[in-house]
Amino acid sequence: MQDILGSVRRSLVFRSSLAGDDGTSGGGLSGFVGKINSSIRSSRIGLFSKPPPGLPAPRKEEAPSIRWRKGELIGCGAFGRVYMGMNLDSGELLAIKQVLIAPSSASKEKTQGHIRELEEEVQLLKNLSHPNIVRYLGTVRESDSLNILMEFVPGGSISSLLEKFGSFPEPVIIMYTKQLLLGLEYLHNNGIMHRDIKGANILVDNKGCIRLADFGASKKVVELATVNGAKSMKGTPYWMAPEVILQTGHSFSADIWSVGCTVIEMATGKPPWSEQYQQFAAVLHIGRTKAHPPIPEDLSPEAKDFLMKCLHKEPSLRLSATELLQHPFVTGKRQEPYPAYRNSLTECGNPITTQGMNVRSSINSLIRRSTCSGLKDVCELGSLRSSIIYPQKSNNSGFGWRDGDSDDLCQTDMDDLCNIESVRNNVLSQSTDLNKSFNPMCDSTDNWSCKFDESPKVMKSKSNLLSYQASQLQTGVPCDEETSLTFAGGSSVAEDDYKGTELKIKSFLDEKAQDLKRLQTPLLEEFHNAMNPGIPQGALGDTNIYNLPNLPSISKTPKRLPSRRLSAISDAMPSPLKSSKRTLNTSRVMQSGTEPTQVNESTKKGVNNSRCFSEIRRKWEEELYEELERHRENLRHAGAGGKTPLSGHKG
């Protein structure tokens, strides 16, 4: 029976088609055939075991949908609003992106196509799994909307964090950028372009882990539709690459441009170009000039170089996400400031440790060998720079330089040096060979070559050396084993150091002259007139009017002065205004002459021109002794604790 009906139907369909082709009157027959076909289709007797070859295959049923409930509004996405939801079966929190469906019949076909695109996208994203990618769970279509169920990430987006906390420090930027590149690398390896990377689409959880979200503009890239690539423009203008704005076709490199713009957003706290242009003006500017956004000046050199690699105007010259993960800005490996000195001690043929030497102990021994009384002069040098010399085995006497040796500069922290007492106690305990080896004044005749780095610090400290030592340093004159560094505060002083000390003595005497001027007596004025006969008495305050009476003449001035002369003068000549006892002590010092001082030029001329200098001096001393005796008698009468002003005994 079924075979008969099938043959009748086929014959009727064939005849109706022939009648239609011939254009004859077959309207009644065709209508009759159509009624038979419709009745057969509506019948449930199952006439056909297989569908006709021209009909599409039946669509597979979707997996059971998730039972969920919509909660509060938490944000707005690219295609609609985002709500918080809950899985009613597991209690898991969800993020539900709701896309409204337009009810208008005019845009019905366009809306249905857009919905199919989103469904295909979510079906694709359900297969992705990565720590830095938001997990998609599925879609649920309703009468007026399409709901996309996603993993809920607490904490908010990067843009919301920038509004709350301001711009991020560079360590935070590095951490977020590295995770962003890891997620983007995973997407690109799976043939997916994000095409809308920005701070608002990067979510951060409470542990600082970021997730790439809002793949509303992403698309499975098996082929780029045409040879020129994708032709649609999606995304936000401030983060758009020039090729996206110009619609010349773009690929994964457009996401790299957006990564660079996102780094600038995190560093400044604002979208790129937002301070210079509005959105429409930014589109025109980027499309016309292909310029990258301004790079903040306070970023590190590695960060600036990273941005330049991301924001190259030529898409083919931008680095991929995999290559950017190896950039020093992301890895944290800073470039060496001095690449020429990167060789370590062990890379050289004969490391210095084989000689039983230590750099710090060697420098400490150099400091201990100095003959100064303390480390004060050493500390004034600032930092001690020396050259680490790698000795080599040779038949010739001494050590030399090799081509492979490196000149590593060492800066010694003065806190590591021993204190003054240990230096003083260890001066005599140092080995003669060690002193000889590390004597910087010796030339190549010793077993070590000496090299001074001509840096500003060393040149400044070299001025503290004595003249004959500086000449040895420049001309390379060899010195004996006992030669050592001697600074300006040492016990042995040269004639060149005499000038500097002379200036200090003059300033000290000028200060004391002002004090003695207040206690001028007729006896002192008489002595001054005898010492300076050509200078009027009114010019007393403009010259060094006082000089100790026991100073020798110019022929007796010593060539070398001990280093303790300043301290002796300061201790022996206190201010005479304090008490009469100090005045007496000052008078005794003026007679004793234990510490010689320098005589100024005006006094020298006065001594040479005065023929009766010795007689006047003897007379002055006698009168001074008489005045002192009268003062002692007054003190004895007044009592042991009595104090009588010196002004009461004038005349």
Swiss-Prot record:
GO terms for cellular component: apoplast; cytoplasm; microtubule. InterPro entries: Kinase-like_dom_sf (IPR011009), MAP_kinase_kinase_kinase (IPR050538), Prot_kinase_dom (IPR000719), Protein_kinase_ATP_BS (IPR017441), Ser/Thr_kinase_AS (IPR008271). One of its GO terms (biological process) is protein autophosphorylation. Residues 105-130, 618-641 form a coiled coil. It is found in: Cytoplasm, Cytoskeleton. It holds the Pfam family Pkinase. It comes from the Eukaryota. The keyword Cytoplasm applies. There is a cross-link at K108, K110 (Glycyl lysine isopeptide (Lys-Gly) (interchain with G-Cter in ubiquitin)). This is Mitogen-activated protein kinase kinase kinase 3.
